[in-house]
């Protein structure tokens, strides 16, 4: 499972990919994108400030794309995922 990040407030996270191994996905019982995001939040601290609020939820203004489909037209947090899937998080909130 690969995560890609765009528009992050953390410059080092911008355009970065994080890949979870099959063992991580299956061993952590990751079945939905919500599970995957919680795992990511817990393991990779640098994702927290740019994409998650203090409850571990995606911040307002973040677009989540699962295998080229907006999660808004899927099942959002309940969308099923598996090893090999691609998830893109895009922050649309920018200072100005």
Swiss-Prot record:
Keywords: Cytoplasm, Isopeptide bond, tRNA processing, Ubl conjugation pathway. It is found in: Cytoplasm. C-terminal thiocarboxylation occurs in 2 steps, it is first acyl-adenylated (-COAMP) via the hesA/moeB/thiF part of UBA4, then thiocarboxylated (-COSH) via the rhodanese domain of UBA4. GO terms for biological process: protein urmylation; tRNA thio-modification; tRNA wobble uridine modification. The modification 1-thioglycine is found at residue 96. Disulfide bonds: none annotated. One of its GO terms (cellular component) is cytosol. It comes from the Eukaryota. Its main location: cytoplasm. Gene3D superfamilies: 3.10.20.30. There is a cross-link at residue 96 (Glycyl lysine isopeptide (Gly-Lys) (interchain with K-? in acceptor proteins)). SUPFAM superfamilies: MoaD/ThiS. Pathway: tRNA modification; 5-methoxycarbonylmethyl-2-thiouridine-tRNA biosynthesis. Acts as a sulfur carrier required for 2-thiolation of mcm(5)S(2)U at tRNA wobble positions of cytosolic tRNA(Lys), tRNA(Glu) and tRNA(Gln). Serves as sulfur donor in tRNA 2-thiolation reaction by being thiocarboxylated (-COSH) at its C-terminus by the MOCS3 homolog UBA4. The sulfur is then transferred to tRNA to form 2-thiolation of mcm(5)S(2)U. Prior mcm(5) tRNA modification by the elongator complex is required for 2-thiolation. Also acts as a ubiquitin-like protein (UBL) that is covalently conjugated via an isopeptide bond to lysine residues of target proteins such as AHP1. Belongs to the URM1 family. This is Ubiquitin-related modifier 1. The lineage of its organism: Eukaryota, Fungi, Fungi incertae sedis, Microsporidia, Unikaryonidae.
């Amino acid at each position: 499972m690969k995560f890609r990040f765009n528009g992050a407030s953390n410059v080092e996270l911008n355009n970065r990919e994080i890949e979870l191994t099959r063992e991580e996905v299956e061993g952590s019982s990751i079945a939905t994108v919500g599970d995957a995001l919680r795992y990511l939040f817990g393991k990779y601290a640098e994702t927290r400030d740019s994409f998650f609020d203090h409850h571990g939820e995606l911040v307002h203004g973040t677009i989540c794309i699962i295998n080229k489909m907006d999660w808004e037209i899927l099942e959002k947090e309940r969308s099923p995922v598996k090893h090999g899937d691609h998830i893109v998080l895009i922050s649309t909130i920018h200072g100005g």
